[in-house]
């Protein structure tokens, strides 16, 4: 009776003011029954793209607003272009949904069009004669309060933390039965259930159970792994999927790298190959700061073995990579076999002869693996001192192998930093979190002239090639620097050279996309003289978004990396 009384009291509570996610409205029409379609999400209104827009989609809008049906589904900003984000694109409804938010689409704020394609509708003037008082917005909080009260329960839950203390809670089967995600609990036989939970996840169990009532939960960087684990174990598929998508968002938000490392171990333990690949990719792009962090010495051997073969591994130089491996293996007491496998992945030809010579004096690993180092050094010295034509004639070296190609070397020898705009104090502080530096060129410029060697071989040490790198945010800036751009590709990065290039050398140049001045969230390739800049949620462009979202909403800077390699099919080698 107390439960029914509480629910009846809830129905008398006035609704809160303001729109809710999924609410819709019509704007800029000649009457209330027509206009540009706008939908509310995360505190603001935005428009809907007309891709795939049809009468079924329009019916959903009109019926939700109290009209009988839609008479027209209009496209091409028939009621004028809107402002703000484009909330939905490629919407496909059956016509029976309560909101466009419940229809199939590309997802919130993922769009391939601009406001010139805003969707509109014309609804029938006759309303259904129905007036709706909707207080349902208060229901999640009211149900959550029922769980918080821990009274009048008919299901008792004993949560055991595997020797780290138990937790006694209770629930209401009547409410749980309304939520398909709670089946694992309400289908139990009897009035009690035991939940066995990892000790580290005990603090989030109460929030997890409350979610079955309110269908709302706050997920943080510290709780996402446990909530994903609980959702997976108890069949809460919506929560499981939500947490899975959040992993990609949370990876760049921890400058200590504890979260990416924990998620990597979790992915391995659960067999989640997608999450594992994401963790490896993020750590490869941010390898340099990882080696400077306290967490470096706790990186598992399997992860380092997965990182070292990658060409898209961002580090100041190959020598610094080897020194980091030396530090890690010494501190962790890695086995002889593990060290040998790691050293085999080092690209010795990417180190200069002087650096190779000094390894025997400066590297702890050298004496224990002397034969391996000597063999690798001799192979590298051949690469540095023998011209390509002679190597091709007398050696069966496969110069297309990764060992003869550079990684993403971020030192000033091979790269230059471009700013997207004014350098903020906050970004500078973030970059000083670690002692490494991304270069000493003018940090405040969106245009850089710099020089690099033509090739990593010592034969080209004094043969420099000049580059000009530019951040191009507008058509006018493209014209100013001699680039041909379209509005769809802006902003874009430009890279040109005014120097003669050896016909036996090719370039696969890259751009590191930085968020907050310190975290690499994507890497793009220069095709010709331009490299695309990914889209962000804030810009809401038709561009593919960065692999890892930028929490600040805009990219702070870009590191242009020059990557030369031998063209083994060049006629000059014959």
UniProtKB/Swiss-Prot annotation:
Location of the SRCR domain: 24-124
Disulfide bridges in this chain: 49-113, 62-123, 93-103
Cited Pfam families: BACK, SRCR
Domain BACK, chain residue ranges per copy: 260-360
Gene Ontology annotations for the cellular component aspect, listed alphabetically: extracellular space; membrane
Alphabetical GO biological process terms: cell adhesion
Domain BTB: 153-221
Residues bearing carbohydrate: 69, 96, 102, 125, 362, 398, 540, 569
Signal peptide location: 1-18
UniProt tissue specificity: Detected in thyroid (at protein level).
Cellular location(s): Secreted; Secreted, Extracellular space, Extracellular matrix
Keywords tagged on the record: Cell adhesion, Disulfide bond, Extracellular matrix, Glycoprotein, Secreted, Signal
SUBUNIT field: Homodimers and homomultimers. The multimers form ring-like structures with a diameter of 30-40 nm. Binds LGALS1 and LGALS3. Binds ITGB1, COL4A1, COL5A1, COL6A1, FN1 and NID. The unglycosylated form interacts with PDE4DIP; this interaction, which is PDE4DIP isoform-specific, may connect a pericentrosomal complex to the gamma-tubulin ring complex (gamma-TuRC) to promote microtubule assembly and acetylation.
Stated name of the protein: Galectin-3-binding protein
